Amino acid sequence: IMIRNLFKISLLSLFISPFLVSQELTSDITGTVSTSTGSVSGAQVEITYEPTNTSITRTTDESGRYFAGGLRPGGPYTITVSAAGLVSQNATTTLVVGDTRRLSFSMASADLVDELIVTGSRVTADRDGFTTLIDAETIATTPSVTRDIKDILKLNPFVTLDDEEDGEESISIGGAHPRTNDLRVDGVSFNDDFGLNSNGYPSQRSPINFGSIEQLAVKVAPASVEYAQFRGGVIDIITKGGTNEFTGDFAYFDRGDSLMGDKLEGEDIDITKDDTAYELAFGGPIIKDELFFYVTYSESEIANPLRYGIQGSGAENILDVTADQAEQVRSAVQSLIGKDPFGPTGATESSQENLTLRLDWTINEKHRLTFNHKDIFGNDLRGSSSSRNRVALYSSRYIKDEETTTNSFHLVSDLADNLISEV
């Protein structure tokens, strides 16, 4: 009996209304088709994603209602509605990840056309918590000196950046600890699970290339079964995909000492700092109208000056240790173990590389497959550091290597006009 009941429950779950299920990687379109006399049944609604010329067709039911789910966020989308004896209508829209766009059409007889009315609105009643949705255009026009998603997340008033720990800015949503957020890129979590970084990332800097973001959503305490393992909020990122047009970008950024002042309170200062990064992006069709790719690569290097150090170390703040005293310690240690206790002088260096690859395959009108691959490689010099009254020896430091690799598949299948499967 128990097995039979479980089977019934599983079977019933397949037919749960798609309007009650929120998708985290895709978007939906719904609406009605009507005339002045009532609903239009059997109307053909063709929905085309213009960048890839991918089309799906839906037929309105007895109440004139149609639904298309599992659609790629962004756009533009062209919706064409046609029915026997009625004038065809067109509408253009863009879609937001995890959202439902409502487009309703009021059609007129082909024999007498007075006015055509197309209305559109976004369904937001199913949103729980406070959400900020950010598209690629907003990202491109928002100033950012760090090329980090933190500059974009600040558009949500519940997001604050805290740099008290190790001088690294961390993301707090709704006042919660930075490590209690869930950062997801194309449905895969990129969190600091072991608590090794102050910024909450699994890497030294942003785990996603700034220019590869198609849409970003900041969700404050969303009450949904989709989300778990968070207390503050969820950051959902969808990356760009290829289209029928070849596109490419190159960007170079420099935030080194050439952009810093050379005086502080009237005194000359000499700071050596390197902070450079570059990004490459390229995408297009492998098979036109069917298979597409989009790849991005970025590399960044930062060399920060020592905050505290002995004379001759090039540090920002010189300790009360003379060069002669330091040399006495160095000579004594080298005579015992043959090592320089202070190690190299100058700057501490860290680097990071990000690689993303996305493939979109329109198998047919009913099945669409997306593959995402991401690599993050980085290293950073860690360990005890000198302070105003302490000189840290080089032996207390170590190189922290970081590597994160993820692969994910996302298959969307149209099982029926009102039944969508996402795996």
What are these regions (language model features)?
Residues D61, G85-V87, A91-S104, E115-G241, ...:
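Periplasmic N-terminal accessory/gating domains of Gram-negative outer-membrane beta-barrel systems
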Residues E301-V423:
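Outer-membrane beta-barrel domain signature, strongest for Gram-negative TonB-dependent receptors
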Residues I173, I237, L280-G284, L357-W361, ...:
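Residues on the lipid-exposed face of transmembrane beta-strands in outer-membrane beta-barrel proteins
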Residues T78, E115-I117, D182, E245-T247, ...:
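Membrane-spanning beta-strand positions in outer-membrane beta-barrel proteins
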Residues V21-T119, T124-A125:
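Periplasm-facing N-terminal accessory domains of Gram-negative outer-membrane beta-barrel systems
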Residues N197-S198, F210-V220, V225-D236, K240-A326, ...:
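Outer-membrane beta-barrel translocator/receptor signature
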Residues D135, S198-P202, A217-K219, G261-G266, ...:
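Extracytoplasmic loops and strand-loop junctions of Gram-negative outer membrane beta-barrel proteins
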Residues E50-N53, P76, T80-A91, F158, ...:
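A short, solvent-exposed loop/turn motif at the edges and junctions
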